[in-house]
């Protein structure tokens, strides 16, 4: 095809190629060259969240306007970011001519963000613009890239992301901000400087152990070890063998209310303190100093914890529940033989739990536990977070609160089990391989995600499927390091499929 036979339209720098025979359609990019004021973002906020699922503590007596403002601040927080991507770089980029030029495909499927369909200014949850109408538009990311999930077409605020691919995004941004492409910003010295700074940060803070093995899994603790080590050793990276491999799924924010009772945070309870401040260390990847972490990031996260996070409650199961079957499941849940409550707590049916804070070894993959090494604890103790809490070795993973468990799939700390049906059944029946992008839909019968985005993939022989997709980042492979789907085997106590179905029905109510 000759250049004369095509015409291209640049959409967020993602070029759609149009010919007489084929049209790759694209949603128009919704932003002007200049940024918006805070007032402009506020004016569209109510319509932007009208379909967002966010449950608040009914005991929160603050006026609705105060809660709304807290939510707005959280969703547009930039933490005074040091790393920005200028909009002009997207507008002038033609790098993506060779790939699909549809905005929804790139942002939603490739990066795996949740599209913010009701927001006329921001395309996806977690993308935060600078709110300065007098400056050129630029972008950073915030907590919502990891703490928003799409289930059956609705966005769930506070849920752990099920599709975000941090490695894909980082790799794409490195290419987008390299010298070749930012050189196209002729006459935009400020934007070229922003792009150069972003490229420097992306390359300076890369370590092999912080690349997750599949999308929608976090290596935040390993990354925190790397960043704290660097600052304690004049910028030197820790050796590969000193950093653990511990891919985990992102936890839901609504578990915060339960975990406050024990003051032990994250999947292994290794951080002790009144706030889950280890999350702030991820800002170190954006080239923050320890001083900026202590004086800017930590105070903001404390404020967000008090104004938003501690007030979140789990979303209600959105489909009909068999009350009689759920009642039978409740009996089993609290029974002497099965006794889920002994580790997971007692529930009032209104989104609240008395959580015992049990952290125990039930035979699951140990890799994430081993991330918190003696070297990591020493690096933590040299950081400003040491005055906010303590990092310690843990004996096991948290018997996690089960509030909103229907939406917290896939299951176990590493997201290695796709449904409650598989989790509560024989370990030998857990699938070795399932497709991560299928997690945008709910399997209502088994409660969790479907195994395949395309049902035809289920017709492929298991050995062929493993050979074809086993190394694909869009598929979860339980044979990879740290990804084992073993442990939490309570089938000998549950015993029958009827009991399993009853337990699942009760779990929908929590």
Predicted regions and their residues:
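N-terminal Sec-pathway targeting helices
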Residues: 2-15
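Hydrophobic alpha-helical targeting segments used for export or membrane insertion
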Residues: 12-19, 402
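Periplasmic c-type cytochrome electron-transfer domains
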Residues: 25-510
């Amino acid at each position: 095809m000759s250049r004369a036979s095509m015409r291209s339209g640049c959409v967020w720098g993602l070029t759609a190629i149009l010919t007489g025979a084929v049209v790759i359609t694209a949603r128009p990019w919704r932003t002007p060259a200049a940024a918006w004021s805070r007032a402009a973002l506020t004016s569209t906020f109510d319509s932007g969240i009208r379909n967002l699922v966010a449950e608040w503590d009914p005991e929160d007596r603050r006026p609705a306007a105060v809660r709304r403002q807290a939510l707005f601040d959280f969703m547009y927080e930039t933490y005074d970011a040091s790393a920005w991507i200028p909009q002009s770089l997207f507008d002038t980029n033609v790098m993506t001519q060779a790939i699909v030029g549809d905005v929804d495909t790139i942002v939603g499927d490739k990066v795996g963000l949740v599209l913010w369909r009701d927001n006329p200014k921001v395309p996806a949850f977690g993308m935060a613009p600078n709110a300065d109408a007098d400056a050129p538009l630029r972008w950073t990311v915030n907590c919502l890239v990891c703490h928003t999930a799409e289930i059956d077409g609705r966005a769930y605020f506070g849920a752990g992301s099920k599709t975000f691919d941090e490695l894909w995004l980082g790799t794409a941004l490195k290419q987008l901000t390299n010298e070749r492409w930012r050189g196209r910003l002729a006459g935009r010295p400020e934007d070229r400087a922003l792009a150069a700074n972003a490229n420097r940060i992306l390359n300076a803070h890369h370590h092999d152990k912080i690349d997750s093995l599949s999308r929608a899994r976090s290596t935040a603790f390993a990354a925190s070890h790397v960043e704290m080590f660097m600052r304690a050793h004049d910028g030197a990276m820790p050796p590969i063998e000193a950093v653990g491999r511990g891919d985990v799924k992102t936890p839901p924010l609504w578990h915060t209310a339960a975990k406050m009772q024990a003051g032990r945070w994250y999947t292994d309870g290794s951080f002790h303190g009144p706030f889950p401040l280890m999350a702030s260390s991820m800002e170190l990847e954006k080239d923050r100093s320890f001083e900026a972490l202590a004086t800017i990031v930590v105070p903001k996260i404390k404020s967000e914890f008090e104004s938003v996070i501690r007030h979140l409650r789990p979303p209600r199961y959105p489909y009909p529940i068999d009350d009689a079957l759920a009642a039978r499941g409740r009996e089993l849940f609290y029974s002497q033989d099965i006794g889920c409550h002994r580790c997971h707590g007692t529930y009032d049916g209104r989104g609240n739990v008395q959580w015992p804070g049990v952290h125990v070894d039930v035979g699951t993959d140990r890799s994430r536990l081993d991330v918190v090494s003696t070297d990591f604890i020493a690096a933590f103790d040299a950081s400003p977070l040491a005055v906010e809490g303590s990092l310690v070795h843990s004996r096991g993973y948290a018997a996690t609160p089960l509030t909103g468990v229907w939406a917290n799939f896939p299951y176990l700390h590493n997201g290695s089990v796709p449904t409650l049906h598989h989790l509560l059944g024989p370990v030998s029946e857990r699938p070795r391989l399932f497709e991560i992008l299928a997690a945008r839909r709910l399997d209502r019968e088994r409660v969790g995600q479907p195994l395949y985005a395309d049902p035809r993939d289920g017709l492929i022989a298991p050995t062929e499927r493993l050979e074809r997709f086993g190394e694909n980042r869009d598929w979860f492979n339980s044979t990879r390091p740290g990804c084992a789907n073993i442990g939490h085997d309570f089938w000998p106590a549950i015993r029958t499929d009827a009991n399993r179905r009853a337990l699942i029905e009760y779990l929908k109510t929590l």
